[in-house]
């Protein structure tokens, strides 16, 4: 058993760098993040964003080097939970950088000893407010009158190093790095810039996104919202998205801003057939109208809509295609684009986390569809701006 590596940095630092467990160099020097991955983190990724080590408090969820340097070999996981929570909660914090999936899981599940881990590649870059943390983590951070602490998950620098050649000198020679290595590093640098903006107060929490659907609105309210969309200026872009189950459309969503969406379920049992037909006609008129349309991999949606007689006119921008032109080295799925071009935290787990007895066409399914529309609209507008620069 090795000696514990204690936290390092100002006890009242506004930024916490929460790692997983120390490596060989950290154990030898009894200081966090001094090995190759720590140097990559502090000397390059955070330094380029203007974040200096002396302004952060660095610590781990497990303070001892694992046997064989593998997390799976730790027999006393959870041993340092109380010490970690006490350290984090000793002073108000602006940002906790959760470095790697074990650090993220600690914040969200409340212990280093967790049954399942959250996938860091999915959650990285998300602005997670403290009300989403585990109850014991929230309690540790509870300061009367202080602003909520934000956590930003980041891919572990060791993953950057493993996925491609690592240029420790920082001279920019990435000729030997594979595609994953390049985009992992780009994502870490993007997230570091976001963290700096949070600390400086330049960005705040994500906007509230309102999704109208059959679970929270009456039929007449949805009908009126669609009519208002039809009456809007035809120059305002409209994002659209569908959800399918077994090759059948379950709902159709539209949004004319990043904060408001309307979802028409095709499976709502409380509506009469004539009401269902009217709303489908309404949304068909919206999609066939003159407004520019935004979609994500929209060929899929357009083909499914065509099968039920809904045309999509004036297609303006496919967010996946636009992003592939601008940044071919980075994946182009909507979760990735959401993390890069909006402040919306990762929400794709809504498809996986629905209640067992909730049908595929329930309220969570509809809200998920509406969020897709809102973020697609926001991503599309930001990509359009970027392409024009």
What residue spans do the PLM features occupy?
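A polyanion-binding, active-site-adjacent surface
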Residues: 1-199
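DnaQ-like (DEDDh/DEDDy) 3′-5′ exonuclease domain used for proofreading
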Residues: 11-13, 188-238, 246
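Short conserved beta-strand segments at catalytic cores or DNA/RNA-binding microdomains
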Residues: 20, 49, 241, 251-259
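Active-site-proximal helix-loop-helix substrate-binding element of RNase H-like nuclease domains
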Residues: 148-152, 157-161, 167-170, 174, ...
């Amino acid at each position: 058993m090795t000696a514990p590596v204690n936290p390092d940095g100002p006890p009242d630092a506004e930024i916490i760098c929460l790692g997983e467990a120390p490596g060989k160099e950290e154990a030898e020097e009894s200081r966090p993040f001094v090995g190759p991955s720590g140097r990559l983190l502090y000397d390059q990724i955070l330094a380029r964003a203007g974040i200096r080590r002396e302004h952060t408090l660095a610590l781990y969820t497990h303070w001892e080097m694992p046997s064989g340097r593998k997390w799976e070999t730790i027999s006393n996981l959870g041993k340092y939970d109380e010490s970690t929570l006490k350290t984090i909660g000793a002073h108000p914090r602006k940002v906790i950088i959760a470095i790697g999936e074990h650090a993220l899981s600690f914040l969200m599940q409340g212990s280093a000893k967790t049954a399942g881990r959250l996938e860091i590649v999915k959650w990285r870059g998300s602005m997670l407010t403290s009300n989403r943390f585990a109850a014991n983590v929230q309690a540790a951070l509870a300061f009367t009158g202080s602003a909520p602490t934000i956590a930003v998950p980041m891919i572990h620098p060791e993953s950057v190093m493993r996925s491609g050649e690592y240029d420790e000198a920082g001279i920019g020679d990435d000729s030997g790095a594979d595609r994953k290595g390049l985009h992992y590093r780009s994502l870490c640098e993007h997230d570091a810039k976001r963290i700096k903006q949070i600390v400086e107060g330049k960005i705040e929490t994500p906007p509230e996104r309102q999704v109208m659907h059959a679970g929270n609105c009456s039929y007449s309210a949805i009908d009126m919202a669609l009519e208002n969309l039809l009456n809007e200026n035809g120059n305002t872009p409209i994002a659209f998205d569908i959800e399918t189950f077994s090759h059948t459309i379950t709902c159709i969503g539209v949004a004319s801003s990043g904060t408001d969406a309307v979802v028409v379920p095709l499976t709502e049992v409380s509506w009469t057939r004539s009401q269902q037909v009217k709303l489908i006609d309404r949304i068909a008129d919206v999609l066939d109208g003159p407004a520019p349309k935004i979609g994500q991999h929209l060929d899929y949606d357009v083909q499914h809509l065509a099968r039920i007689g809904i045309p999509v006119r004036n297609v303006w921008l496919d967010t996946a295609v636009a992003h592939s032109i601008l940044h071919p080295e980075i994946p182009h799925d909507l979760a990735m684009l959401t993390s890069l071009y909006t402040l919306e935290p990762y929400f794709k787990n809504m498809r996986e986390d629905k209640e067992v007895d909730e049908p595929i066409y329930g309220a969570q399914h509809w809200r998920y569809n509406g969020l897709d529309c809102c973020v697609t609209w926001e991503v599309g507008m930001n990509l359009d701006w970027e392409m024009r620069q």
